[in-house]
Amino acid sequence: MIEKHIVLEDIDPVIFYGVNNANIQMIKALYPKLRIVARGNVIKVMGDEEEMCAFEESIIALEKHCVKYNSLKEEVIIDIIKGKTPQIEKTGDTIVFSVTGKPIVPRSENQLKLVKEYEKNDMIFAIGPAGSGKTYTAIALAVRSLKNKEIKKIILSRPAVEAGEKLGFLPGDMKDKIDPYLQPLYDALQDMIPAAKLKEYMELNIIQIAPLAFMRGRTLNAAVVILDEAQNTTTQQIKMFLTRMGMNTKMIVTGDMTQIDLPSSQKSGLVQAMHILKGVKGISFIELNKKDIVRHKLVTRIVVAYEKFEEKQKEERLNDSKKREGDSNK
């Protein structure tokens, strides 16, 4: 009789073992000749060497399934241990699976375009209104790359100041000050990565969420780096960010041109970057619009209403300018 320890490295053991350890109990029942003890992320197994080799192969296959789908069902366990291919429901253009096992898919033509451009280019600019799914899709792509071990880390960043608020006047330490700005990024990650695994990734700096200023001086290798709310960067800030790109790295820059919170005297770095970098090989630009909005149906109506209001204001300013010009010529 020999003994072996198998470490579950890439998954949350709670999901793998199942509710009330139902999954591990089933695995034990399917390997009655082995003595199996599971504690934490380590499975200790004792028994015949040949039987143990088959057991280890099954555990590796089950772990891979669990990493991909964030779930492990009874019928899947039976199929894998019996050497069959699990019957998985076809999920089309699935990017990644949520913590509940549901497929996260592009929900519009432009979101699908973002997915395809990500596969072809190393730098993507995704511009569109609130709720168009640009950031959520970008994070899903990053999580997929991490799960597939194509990269070593995910770095998510935002400008730290939005809507006119200044960090120095907010209560708490630096983490307390910046966390509210970064919460939308946490929310997306929590949809896609089990809580215990996400906490581990963040403690090990495999997933990093930080204000844009924290990027200065770094070279980011083997990573997917996402800059969200890029319309609120200055020219110097976005140039600094884009030049952090290292080897085997992809960058996704997202922004909404209708929500620029910079002082009126300051130009948006995103606007300038789109003009300067247009036509550069390896950089893709995707524009999402109100048709891509996947929030409550009222959000689309609100966006349309504001577009009409802003267009009307633009016309009024133009008419006023023409009137003043006519008056000055009299």
PLM region spans:
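Hydrophobic side chains in well-ordered alpha-helices
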Residues: 23, 55-58, 238
